[in-house]
Amino acid sequence: MIRNVAIVLTLAASPSYAEKLTLVAFGDSLTQGYGLPQADGFVPQLQSWLTANGAEVTVLNAGVSGDTTAGGLARFDWTLTPDVDAILLNLGGNDLLRGIDPASSRANLDAMLTKAQALNIPVLLVGLRAPGNYGPGFKADFDAMYPDLAAKFNIPVTDNYFFPLIDQATRLLSTDLMQPDGLHPNPKGVIVAVNALGPQVLDLLAKVKK
């Protein structure tokens, strides 16, 4: 009897193992894995990285090639199912390519973050930077969008998804890490991007309250 009581007390005092979490990677072709074999895409590589680093998580691919922030907002509610614990939000690249007014992109991202916040779902916002050829006003507005939203919603943000893929000698995206289109990373580039983002994703998952 004493032995049984001791076992019960020991189990009660032991730390409980966390449930497996669900992380939604929500974005465009960078998330979806455009131009890559499935296993080499961003989501499978992130899943492998997180598992190797001890995270009990399933990463779901909610990337749609060509999606804008408006498109993302239109499908965001479908993604917010009860099993979603955290979101990695990477949208805005196609808005940039199309020259969409940053004010519109900001409003769409704001609406998505508002929805996530209402459900207490932690979000990591993946930032981007506009090139100078859009003009100084456009660039300033676009570049400020991500840090401003992160500050408003008190969420973490990455400065620039592509920063780890830049050749520091040329200050341009490394051709060794990019597909021939110059817009999407190749398998090697995906690994570099995942290695850069991974620690922040671990921090995001640590904020989940089950």
Question: Can you annotate each of these PLM segments?
Answer:
Residues M1-V5:
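Bacterial N-terminal signal peptides that target proteins for export
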Residues A6, G41, K188:
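Active-site phosphate/pyrophosphate-handling residues
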Residues A13-P15:
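N-terminal signal peptide c-region/cleavage motif recognized by signal peptidases
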Residues Y17-S65, R75-D83:
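Serine-esterase "nucleophile elbow" of acetyl-processing enzymes
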Residues Q45, A55, G71-K210:
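Alpha-helical cap/lid subdomain in secreted, periplasmic
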Residues G66-A70:
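N-terminal helical cap/lid subdomain that shapes the substrate entry/recognition surface
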